[in-house]
Amino acid sequence: MTDLEKPNLAGHMFDVGLIGGGISGLAAAKLLSEYKINVLVLEARDRVGGRTYTVRNEHVKWVDVGGAYVGPTQNRILRLSKELGIETYKVNVNERLVQYVKGKTYPFRGAFPPVWNPLAYLDYNNLWRTMDEMGKEIPVDAPWQARHAQEWDKMTMKDLIDKICWTKTAREFAYLFVNINVTSEPHEVSALWFLWYVRQCGGTARIFSVTNGGQERKFVGGSGQVSEQIMGLLGDKVKLSSPVTYIDQTDDNIIVETLNHEHYECKYVISAIPPILTAKIHFKPELPPERNQLIQRLPMGAVIKCMVYYKEAFWKKKDYCGCMIIEDEEAPIAITLDDTKPDGSLPAIMGFILARKADRQAKLHKDIRKRKICELYAKVLGSQEALYPVHYEEKNWCEEQYSGGCYTAYFPPGIMTQYGRVIRQPVGRIYFAGTETATQWSGYMEGAVEAGERAAREVLNALGKVAKKDIWVEEPESKDVPAIEITHTFLERNLPSVPGLLKITGVSTSVALLCFVLYKIKKLPC
């Protein structure tokens, strides 16, 4: 842009421009505003919220078709939502959960389905224990510095699972565990990245659990309120339908241009969008090579979120809570949770279509997807009432051009160790937020808040308002949602793996011994 072409920026000058009006960008803007910093938030969509989105209509009152869940140890989002006057409620797991595998339904209670096969039990136990132990070796703020980083980053999670698991039962559930947690396939993701991801969410039990875990609660009225209320506080500082296309930081201030040719001048910029979406922006000067390479190598996960509404919560007649873990290649849905309103109205089941299945099911008409889901629920829950919904909502995040997918970006093999260290590294006066840059609960709303507030403090430090030592701040535990420590029994800590047991004793002796041990701890029926 020549001097003759420079736009008139009268009334368009700000201290900090924020790209992205999701929770991360708005959390950053809110914190900066509290320091009397003049901010501008540019959001590409016609709404705020990013990967959180609360739909409102007469059929559902409100429903979260994007990010929704919060729980213990997610203290930043709990603090922010409380400050905004948004209450939480517990997701219902009072009744039994069910596992559907090999065409049969098995009710259970707890975080993970029980395992009746002695060797499979040993295999499961070793899987969770090994993943957690490996995760503890990985620094949450610098996973590329882990002692085995190079080795683990060359492996896919499929490679690692196949190496750890001895039984097909444990192996297939482990594949599903990857699908559910990061909406991608085990062969697509780096073992180092996935182990880090689970670790920074508190471990295998915390990330997968409802009670005392990442899915314990939702917001009354929907998670979209977090962004909507911050937008209300910021007023006209939030510009919707303003995709950023150009950033020029060659002069004293940064020039930001949007798709509709609006121009703004800022001292600093915070990018709070998924890394791969910054490839839609033209930068002057060009991004450093490592940053440019990184953003081309972080694809987004794939998910369709589906809510089926019923006249009544018929599943409770069988003492089921609505949570289903479904292991069936032909089934569209992999996992469900009760999505009934906290007052018991509008009974609903939320289900995720994940990874490869999201691509497959997206090719079908919405009505066919709905029918297939209802038929699946009828089969798993053993009730024809599942065939007669009163309403259906869904959101295919793969078709969102300003998200690219959900829940989060993932690291394929080799990328974390080669380029991961630049994910939060500023480029000149451009800083980076977004849940992908977090070190606790990355991929969740909690990670979005952590990243946004950290990036805001980096800018405040550059402005001389915050000391460098105060950029990273520990968050006090929520008094309203305290965490319960996750512990493991002596046997869980010390039982051998299947190969370990077979190495010590003969096969027949091993099976007999294991059956006796499991009988004693009441893992097997009398």
UniProtKB/Swiss-Prot annotation:
<feature type="region of interest" description="Interaction with membrane phospholipid headgroups">
    <location>
        <begin position="520"/>
        <end position="522"/>
    </location>
</feature>
<dbReference type="GO" id="GO:0042443">
    <property type="term" value="P:phenylethylamine metabolic process"/>
</dbReference>
<feature type="modified residue" description="S-8alpha-FAD cysteine">
    <location>
        <position position="406"/>
    </location>
</feature>
<keyword id="KW-0531">Neurotransmitter degradation</keyword>
<keyword id="KW-0274">FAD</keyword>
<dbReference type="Pfam" id="PF01593">
    <property type="entry name" value="Amino_oxidase"/>
</dbReference>
<feature type="modified residue" description="Phosphoserine">
    <location>
        <position position="383"/>
    </location>
</feature>
<feature type="site" description="Important for catalytic activity">
    <location>
        <position position="374"/>
    </location>
</feature>
<keyword id="KW-0812">Transmembrane</keyword>
<dbReference type="InterPro" id="IPR050703">
    <property type="entry name" value="Flavin_MAO"/>
</dbReference>
<dbReference type="InterPro" id="IPR036188">
    <property type="entry name" value="FAD/NAD-bd_sf"/>
</dbReference>
<dbReference type="GO" id="GO:0042424">
    <property type="term" value="P:catecholamine catabolic process"/>
</dbReference>
<dbReference type="GO" id="GO:0050660">
    <property type="term" value="F:flavin adenine dinucleotide binding"/>
</dbReference>
<protein>
    <recommendedName>
        <fullName>Amine oxidase [flavin-containing] A</fullName>
        <ecNumber>1.4.3.21</ecNumber>
        <ecNumber>1.4.3.4</ecNumber>
    </recommendedName>
</protein>
<dbReference type="GO" id="GO:0005739">
    <property type="term" value="C:mitochondrion"/>
</dbReference>
<keyword id="KW-0560">Oxidoreductase</keyword>
<keyword id="KW-1000">Mitochondrion outer membrane</keyword>
<keyword id="KW-0007">Acetylation</keyword>
<keyword id="KW-0472">Membrane</keyword>
<keyword id="KW-0285">Flavoprotein</keyword>
<dbReference type="InterPro" id="IPR001613">
    <property type="entry name" value="Flavin_amine_oxidase"/>
</dbReference>
<dbReference type="GO" id="GO:0042420">
    <property type="term" value="P:dopamine catabolic process"/>
</dbReference>
<keyword id="KW-0496">Mitochondrion</keyword>
<feature type="modified residue" description="N-acetylmethionine">
    <location>
        <position position="1"/>
    </location>
</feature>
<keyword id="KW-0128">Catecholamine metabolism</keyword>
<dbReference type="GO" id="GO:0009967">
    <property type="term" value="P:positive regulation of signal transduction"/>
</dbReference>
<keyword id="KW-0597">Phosphoprotein</keyword>
<feature type="topological domain" description="Cytoplasmic">
    <location>
        <begin position="1"/>
        <end position="497"/>
    </location>
</feature>
<comment type="subunit">
    <text>Monomer, homo- or heterodimer (containing two subunits of similar size). Each subunit contains a covalently bound flavin. Enzymatically active as monomer.</text>
</comment>
<dbReference type="GO" id="GO:0097621">
    <property type="term" value="F:monoamine oxidase activity"/>
</dbReference>
<keyword id="KW-1133">Transmembrane helix</keyword>
<dbReference type="GO" id="GO:0042428">
    <property type="term" value="P:serotonin metabolic process"/>
</dbReference>
<feature type="transmembrane region" description="Helical; Anchor for type IV membrane protein">
    <location>
        <begin position="498"/>
        <end position="518"/>
    </location>
</feature>
<feature type="topological domain" description="Mitochondrial intermembrane">
    <location>
        <begin position="519"/>
        <end position="526"/>
    </location>
</feature>
<dbReference type="GO" id="GO:0008131">
    <property type="term" value="F:primary methylamine oxidase activity"/>
</dbReference>
<dbReference type="GO" id="GO:0005741">
    <property type="term" value="C:mitochondrial outer membrane"/>
</dbReference>
<dbReference type="GO" id="GO:0051378">
    <property type="term" value="F:serotonin binding"/>
</dbReference>
<feature type="site" description="Important for substrate specificity">
    <location>
        <position position="335"/>
    </location>
</feature>
<comment type="similarity">
    <text>Belongs to the flavin monoamine oxidase family.</text>
</comment>
<comment type="function">
    <text>Catalyzes the oxidative deamination of primary and some secondary amine such as neurotransmitters, with concomitant reduction of oxygen to hydrogen peroxide and has important functions in the metabolism of neuroactive and vasoactive amines in the central nervous system and peripheral tissues. Preferentially oxidizes serotonin. Also catalyzes the oxidative deamination of kynuramine to 3-(2-aminophenyl)-3-oxopropanal that can spontaneously condense to 4-hydroxyquinoline.</text>
</comment>
<dbReference type="InterPro" id="IPR002937">
    <property type="entry name" value="Amino_oxidase"/>
</dbReference>
